[in-house]
Amino acid sequence: MDASSSPSPSEESLKLELDDLQKQLNKKLRFEASVCSIHNLLRDHYSSSSPSLRKQFYIVVSRVATVLKTRYTATGFWVAGLSLFEEAERLVSDASEKKHLKSCVAQAKEQLSEVDNQPTESSQGYLFEGHLTVDREPPQPQWLVQQNLMSAFASIVGGESSNGPTENTIGETANLMQELINGLDMIIPDILDDGGPPRAPPASKEVVEKLPVIIFTEELLKKFGAEAECCICKENLVIGDKMQELPCKHTFHPPCLKPWLDEHNSCPICRHELPTDDQKYENWKEREKEAEEERKGAENAVRGGEYMYV
């Protein structure tokens, strides 16, 4: 039998392969090859796939977009991502999926356009992340700049104490002091930001607007009991009350829930989080989730004896 007549892989095996490729996206050295493999599978099998497999394709492609935005920003990665997003946008028919993929395409093009528009000098640095080059060195981190300024300041002050101040040393000292102050203004906000998890912003306005509203019926009254109440206003629920339902299935009066979600992004009862409009916070959550998965993987590996040394 020739290759052209060989049977196509079953949907089950395709799902397993997509699962494995999605995991490979977390490994930087495997990212680009994984994206290319996902692209090939999408091109060859999406049109004949079942709705559930099509959904899995969409989830994996969306994961590629998330990883590009939050972790791997090298130009080559974005080029591979753009090709995948364009193929996916061409194939999908669901309106919301197509809209999201269009935004992924636009963001990839914007990212690559920014790289193209950078001054020629900047292209003489690193060919890719981690590459060692003999061209100009990257800028020093701010902490090292401050350390060098402190050393210079201490040297000048030491010279003044032994030889007495001169007009030149007084001027140099004043200049160094000003540079130190300016540098601290740049460092302190970063220190404060890194001191712990960021404060959770309000829930996304679009998500809140789409929360379903249900009517409290006699059947629900029997289910929850006569003492059922809105936990925000503490009023007992009565038949006919309009209730807004969160993804965690907890319900509240819409006028009670709105002020809460204007300031928080979580359920008042179980703290299940809703998406927010703050991309920086969403990126932080994504990194925390990945870090937690890596910690669990390491713990499981140690328990399983994968990293035992003799």
Curated annotation (Swiss-Prot):
Post-translational modification: Auto-ubiquitinated.
Domain of life: Eukaryota
Record EC number: 2.3.2.27
Phenotypic consequence of gene deletion: Hypersensitivity to abscisic acid (ABA).
Tissues and organs where the protein is expressed, per its UniProt entry: Highly expressed in leaves and at lower levels in flowers and seeds.
Entry's localization field: Nucleus; Cytoplasm
UniProtKB keywords: Abscisic acid signaling pathway, Coiled coil, Cytoplasm, Metal-binding, Nucleus, Transferase, Ubl conjugation, Ubl conjugation pathway, Zinc, Zinc-finger
Region (Disordered): 285-310
UniProt catalytic activity: S-ubiquitinyl-[E2 ubiquitin-conjugating enzyme]-L-cysteine + [acceptor protein]-L-lysine = [E2 ubiquitin-conjugating enzyme]-L-cysteine + N(6)-ubiquitinyl-[acceptor protein]-L-lysine
GO BP, one annotated term: abscisic acid-activated signaling pathway
Annotated metabolic or biological route of this protein: Protein modification; protein ubiquitination
Enzyme class: transferase
Xref: SMART domains: RING
PROSITE patterns recorded: ZF_RING_2
Annotated InterPro entries: Znf_RING, Znf_RING/FYVE/PHD
Residue runs in coiled coils: 276-306
Compositional bias per record (Basic and acidic residues), positions renumbered to this chain: 285-298
Major localisation: nucleus
Xref: Pfam families: zf-RING_2
Cellular component GO terms held in the UniProt record: cytosol; nucleus
GO MF entries: ubiquitin-protein transferase activity; zinc ion binding
Zinc finger (RING-type): 230-271
Known function: E3 ubiquitin-protein ligase that acts as a negative regulator of abscisic acid (ABA) signaling. Mediates ubiquitination and subsequent proteasomal degradation of the transcription factor ABI3.
Subunit structure: Interacts with ABI3 (via C-terminus).
Protein name listed in UniProt: E3 ubiquitin-protein ligase AIP2
Organism whose genome encodes this protein: Arabidopsis thaliana (Mouse-ear cress)
